[in-house]
Amino acid sequence: MTSALPFDDFRNLLANLPAADTAAETRVRALFAKADKPGNSLGRIEDIAAWLAAWSGRAPPAVTRPLMAVFAGNHGVTRHGISPRPVAATANAVELCAAGGAAINQICIAYDLGLKVFDLALHIPTADITEDAALDERGCAATMAFGMEAIAGGTDLLCLGDLGVGNSTVAAALFATLF
């Protein structure tokens, strides 16, 4: 279903997510409650396990198809010389990942994680955030839709990463805006 408004499809998707499996969550919490250990001695891991059980519908929860998705893009703000690295370094890093020689490749091999690297049109940088929004609504929605390809083929744990010259500047600007 496609709408005339850029984010309507995402709003619809979020509004129609399946409900959490509260029975699976309850079973996991019960397992922790009857375990021979001091109360809440595992800290947040108990809450994380219960959350994963609720959203996966499996108690106890299990991660069998983890995936690391790395999104590579170039930012218009780099024209101000904000990084000592040239913009071409992003494409070089993507090529290194594709060849299996990047650090993320080795981490994924060591921990049996799937890896997908997405080139977000490296030849078309976003707008310069010192002058305008990096993406307009349509561009943002299109990029989000492209990003949803990360889960094509299925995954039960999605880890996200970014790659690109200028990313830390844009992240700092977002942080400053939000907080």
Language model segments and positions:
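N-terminal loops that bind phosphate or other acidic moieties
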Residues: 1-179
